[in-house]
Structures are given as structure tokens and as C-alpha cells.
């Protein structure tokens, strides 16, 4: 359960939204993380997810985290744009790490 923080980019591992990138926007009293993606999981109705059902990434969306801590509202369209750019970055980082690991094996 450690490692998650506000603005952290995560990928859903279980449930009907498998594979969907989302952003952690909070935590409820039961230890579940509140995640949004601006589309299937809108800002006004964040999805409660068990931390075991989320795959952590290395990216933190600092603008999202800053807005949350300052108490500013998040906009679904803006959030989708942030997620899209972060998802592309994460995919590139993952491919780079995978290629590096492959080279080390050879």
C-alpha cells in the first residue's frame, strides 16, 4: 500500500476498467485509494480501488497533486490531457527499461 501518493499515475489491474491509466486523488477511511481518469471515472465521482488492484508507475502528475493540495477543482478535460501526455511518457520509459534489461541479459 505504500508508494501511492496524490497525483501518482496508476494502471487498473482488476475490475471492469482493466488497463485504464488513472490518477490517485485521495484515500478513503477504509484504506482504498480514490482514482479518476476524467472519462470512465469522472472527477465528481472518483472510483474507490483496493491498492492491490492498481499497478504503480514511476510518474507523479505534479500539476494534479498541486491542484488537489491547494483545494482547486479538477476539470475532466484537463485531467484527460494530463493523463494522455503522462501515459505516453510512461510507455516510453517502460520500453526503454525493457530494452535495457534485454541488453543486460545478452
Describe the role of every protein-language-model region.
Residues 1-6, 13, 23-106:
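Ferredoxin-like alpha/beta domains used as RNA- or RNAP-binding modules
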Residues 15-18:
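Short, charged beta-turn/beta-strand-edge "cap" motif at the junction between a beta-strand
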Amino acid at each position: 500500500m505504500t508508494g501511492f501518493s496524490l497525483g501518482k499515475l496508476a494502471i487498473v489491474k482488476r475490475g471492469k476498467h482493466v488497463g485504464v491509466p488513472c490518477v490517485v486523488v485521495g484515500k478513503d477511511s477504509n484504506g482504498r485509494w480514490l482514482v479518476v481518469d476524467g472519462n470512465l471515472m469522472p472527477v465528481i465521482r472518483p472510483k474507490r480501488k483496493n491498492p492491490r488492484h492498481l499497478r504503480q508507475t514511476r510518474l507523479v502528475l505534479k500539476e494534479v497533486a498541486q491542484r488537489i493540495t491547494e483545494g482547486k477543482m479538477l476539470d475532466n478535460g484537463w485531467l484527460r490531457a494530463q493523463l494522455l501526455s503522462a501515459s505516453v511518457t510512461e510507455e516510453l520509459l517502460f520500453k526503454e527499461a525493457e530494452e535495457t534489461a534485454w541488453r543486460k541479459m545478452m
